[in-house]
Structure formats: structure tokens, C-alpha cells
Amino acid sequence: MLTHKTCQARKKMQVSFVIRDAEEKQHRNGVNALQLDANNGKLYSAGRDAIIRVWNTRTDSSEKYIQSMEHHNDWVNDIVLCCNGRNLISASCDTTVKVWNAQKGFCMSTLRTHRDYVQALAYAKDREQVASAGLDKAIFLWDVNTLTALTASNNTVTTSSLTGSKDSIYSLAMNPSGTVIVSGSTENILRIWDPRTCMRIMKLRGHTENVRCLVVSPDGNQVVSGSSDGTIKVWNLGQQRCVQTIHVHKEGVWSLLMSENFQYIISGSRDRNIIVTEMRNPSNKTLVCEEQAPVLSLGYNIDKTGVWATTWNSDIRCWKLPMYDRCTLNSSGGMDAQWTQGGTEVACIKGGAAIKECAVLNDKRYIITKDSQDQVVVYDVLRVVKKEQLGAVDYEAEVKKRNKQVYIPNWFTVDLKTGMPTIVLGQEEVDCFSAWVSIEAGLPECVDPTTEIKINYGKLLLEALLEYWTPPHSIPPNEMEPDMHGNGYFQVPKHTPVIFSEVGGRTVCRLLVRDAAGDSESTLLHETAPQWVTDVVIEKNIPKFLKIPFFLQPHPQMTKPERTKKDRLVANEFIQCRKVCEHVLEKVLNAETTPSGGNANNSLQNSQSDANSEGSQLPAEERIELWCNDVVVDPNMDLRTVRHFIWKQSTDLTFQYKTKQNFNYDGSIGDSLERVTRKY
């Protein structure tokens, strides 16, 4: 027995997991942010696949991958390197800010102060201070030295907040000395604070759409902003006004990078262009390159002769920067200024494909996906593995070909936001315990021909995902009874990430399948796992069967239609129609039945009629024919499949029965047909 902690105020929970390889060396979706450690040439990239990756930019080899930093479970929106490259701070759509050991790549602590997506970070190098902001309109200030000192026992941290924002914040910037912090939001204005006092200084109007990117000058006197309105604006904080508006892009400006002397702006846009512009003379501009997708972030290479760029795609490219040369002699003997040639791709870190389409097959076990490179793949949701790589085949044709005429209730949903298939289990709109199937249909490789076992997909999967979880304070099993872990049929990959989160809300816990055996993880699961999970995984309770009511009546062509009244019955929805045939023979026609295989259902026991008759040795489905909506029903179909594909009505399912030509019955129907609701 396990005493599970419950909380009346706890929000409804869901469990999700990702079907993926043990090591994902390539980004599988767009890359939102970059940070370069110029001391060792390491480039950190924040992916929409929820993974931060580290690359060696000093090698000319195509294999630049060093390691992955994994603990987020949604887009990583921003990252900053601090403490001379020893630590990294990240912000994510999973509503958390995380502190990392940048050298070893592990998560040191998680900050859960934000209540919505955390979109942006800002860093004051001289003060070792970080600010975070997001869609909850909040800005929090963090002391980095305090964050990096957090431990399991010393896990209390205080933060200062900057108030006054009235809308979602998408951009944030501080100068190195930490005297000015600026935010940009869907208010279309810039708000400025003094982070030393948390006092609001001013707000600046001028943009007409969301302010997506910001840079503050080292002295804190100037701010450069980029907006979805397509403009770049230069602001003088002393004058509290815009002093320059630059129009070099056709669409929104999403990323800005400044030269060290704050004279040149490198901008990346939704129009896919990266442009260098002289700030004081915007007519002096040049196109660095046209990327393959909208530009999300920019960062210098080690010697600042090139710029790394990320986009909606998963590749990371480095482009040579043109230089502005003022020492060119013109034909009249004067001096001209012109740009040297740039725009050459000098390096590329290749990314992987993102899954863009997904179809759940009717058997509700397999899904078929199509990625950004048109590759089609079949995944086994139950076993959490990639089953088959089909290549660049016709996606729609494969879905149609592999869909069987079988109906199983939806028991999971699929989320493709990260570019990898994330499977979500819950108890809300989709009940993860709704899919009962026969073991023959669900796990044919585990079939024992002497049994008619029914399995529940959701129960089996949760047991496999939490196989290694031994809750604290659980009573040791009886020595005569084995301590059952897992589901007894199969295991899932140990590297699979499992996430517990609030429905439509925040992440509460993330761990790998193999890590559930750890003491801290076990305790965290004990405090986090919802009751519906512990009921099946720990208490080994059986989910409830779903019932279907239906009517049974003689077919008009019956030889002896003595009884025409409908009789209403109720059965488990996964009961196959051959069981209904057995019921007709046994209870309606008073004939002896031979079960179709295995042990008959308790409510469908053999009658006591003559067992020596030749007809009684035939299975019921060879003696009785079931009809529904003027269609002969396959005896292998279950009730829910008949209702979905043949009946197709909201009213109770109705069957008509008649004997086949090779079978005649002499029994009197009489009172053998039950007039009351019968449960199978």
C-alpha cells in the first residue's frame, strides 16, 4: 500500500513523453538563440526542440557537436552565458528559468517564478545579474552568484520584480554595468527601469507593432529596437525620444547585433535578410545574405569577421561580414566609402528534420508522420519506438493503406511543437484508459491461445514508463508475492523523457524512464504523480470497462420469427460480435454452442442441450448471422467498431439475427430471450 500525497488545490495533471533517439545530435526544429564563449570557441544554441546544444566552432570538421543540455520540455527561447562561461541561464515556454553548469552540461536548479512562457533574458556582466521576462508581463531580477549556489537543501532564492508592464513581454536588454534595463512588448512601447532601485524611469512610444529585439549601449544612453512593424529605431534615453528610424527590411525585425563601437547595426528579419547598416548614416547599408527562412537570432564568430545566424529551420550558418571601407580613391581623386565583399557562407551546423504532419491510425497504436524533408515514418506509441522508416513516399496513401476498419477510442494526443512526437496522456477530453483491446489484437506477440485476456493500452504504457519507480514509504511486498514492476509484457526505451505537467499549464516534473529509481526522483514522483497514475502503477487497480447498450431482435427473414420484440442488452464495448452470436444460440434459440476460442464469457456459458448433435459442434458464428443497417457483420468486429463504421447513429446500436442456411433449430424461443437488460 502507498499513502499518496494529495492536495485539494492541485490542478489537473497530464503525463507526456517524447519518442526519440537516446542522443539527438541535431536540432529538430528552429533555433531561437545563440551564445558564443570566445575563450574556447564553444557555441551554445537554444532549440525549439527543447534542447540546448553545444558546438565546437574551432574545428573545420563537419562534426562540431559536443553535448546536449536537456531539462526543458518546450521551446528554449533565450540563453545567456555568465560567470566567464562557467554557467548558462535559459528561459523556456515551459515557464521555467534554468541554471546550468555550462562546462559539464547539467541543470543545477530550476526557477518557477514565472506563470507563463518566459520569452527573454538580459545580462549585466559587471554585476553578474540576470533579468527574465515573458508573457505573464513580469520581469524578475536574479543574482547569478546566488543562483549558482543553490542546492537541494539550500533552495530558497529571493528576487526583485519590475512592475508596470501591461502586456506580454517579448524582448529585454541591459547594459553591462546594470544601470538600465529595457523591455519591449505587444504594447508597442519601450519601458525603462533602473534595476538598482527597481524604479520605472520612462516609457518610449514610436513603434506600431510588437517590439521583438533590443540592444542597450554600454554607457546606457542609447537603445536600438527592432519591431514587427519592420523598422529599427534608435532612442536617446537622455532626450527620451527616438532620434533615428531605419527602414531596411520589408517585414518584421526579429534580431539585432551591434558592433563594439555601437556604430553598425546587423539586423535579421522575417523577410530572411541579414543587413549591415551604419547607424548614423542608414543609407550606408549592405546585404550580408538572404537566409532560407525568417531569421531568429544573430551572434558573432570568434574573431567577429562573421556572424552566426539561426532561423525557423534547424541549420545554423556562419556568414562572412562585409567591411565598410572609407579609404577607396574615386576617379576624381576624392575618397569614397564602400563595402567590401561579404555574404559568403563560411560554416554550417546541419540540423535535422522537424515533423510537420501526423496521423493516428485507427488501431490507436501506431502513428504515421511526415517531416520537413518529406520523410515518412511509422511510430509505435505503445512501445515508444520508431517502427519503420518509409522514406519519401506518398504520405496520404500510406495512411490510407495502413488504416484498418477497426474502431478504438482515442486514448492519447500528439503534440508536434518541438519537431519530435510528444505523446500526451490525461483524464480530460481524452481518457488515457479508454482503449481496451484483446491481447490478440493489441499484443499478438504475447498471445497465449488458451486465454482471452483484455489489455488496456494506457495502463500498460504508464506501467512501462514508470517501471523503475519504487515509491518511498511503500509497504514491502509479501515474500510469497513477487514485487511486480512494469507491465509484464514489454519495456520502453530507458532514455525516454517523461514529463508531468498541469493541463494547459506549467511543467511540474521531468525525468528519464531509467532515472525513476533514484531517491530524489522517487520522492518527486510521489509528490507529483496524480492519483489516476498511482492507482494503476502502484496500486495495480484495473481501469473501468466502458459499456455499450444495444438492441437484439430477429431478422425479418428468420424462419420462425415467433418473437419480434427488441431486447435491450449491455456489454463491454470490446466484446466481439461472435459473443453476441453465442448469446443468440444459447439464450435465444436454446441451442448448444461451441465457443469460438478460449474460455467463454461467464455470462455466455454453454447451455445444457444435446452435445452430441452435429450442428452443436460448429462455432456460433457459423450458425448465426448478425445484421446491422442491412449489412452482414463480421463476427471478429467488436461492438464499438460496428457502432462507428456500420451503425453510424447516435441512437442505441441495433442488431438483427438470423440462422444460416446450414443450421436449423427446433428449440422453442419461449421465455429463453431475456426481457431485461443483460450485462456481458
Curated annotation (Swiss-Prot):
Give the residue range of the signal peptide. Answer: none
Task: Quote the function comment for this protein.
Answer: Regulatory component of the Usp12-46 deubiquitylase complex. activates deubiquitination by increasing the catalytic turnover without increasing the affinity of deubiquitinating enzymes for the substrate. The complex deubiquitylates the wg/wingless-signaling receptor arr/arrow, which stabilizes the receptor and increases its concentration at the cell surface; this enhances the sensitivity of cells to wg/wingless-signal stimulation.
| Record's keyword terms, sorted | Repeat, Ubl conjugation pathway, WD repeat
What is the protein name for this chain? WD repeat-containing protein 48 homolog
Its family? Belongs to the WD repeat WDR48 family.
Q: Which biological processes are named by the entry's GO terms?
A: double-strand break repair via homologous recombination
Q: Which domain of life is it from?
A: Eukaryota
What are the protein's GO molecular function terms?
ubiquitin binding
Region feature (Disordered): 592-616
The record's subunit annotation is: Catalytic component of the Usp12-46 deubiquitylase complex consisting of Usp12-46, Wdr20 and Uaf1; regulatory subunit that, together wtih Wdr20, stabilizes Usp12-46. The Usp12-46 deubiquitylase complex associates with arr/arrow; the interaction leads to deubiquitination and stabilization of arr/arrow.
Q: Where are the WD repeats?
A: 26-65, 71-110, 113-152, 164-203, 206-245, 248-287, 290-329, 350-389
Disulfide linkages recorded for this protein, renumbered to the chain, are none
Q: Mind telling me which InterPro entries this protein's record contains?
A: G-protein_beta_WD-40_rep, WD40/YVTN_repeat-like_dom_sf, WD40_repeat_CS, WD40_repeat_dom_sf, WD40_rpt, WDR48, WDR48/Bun107
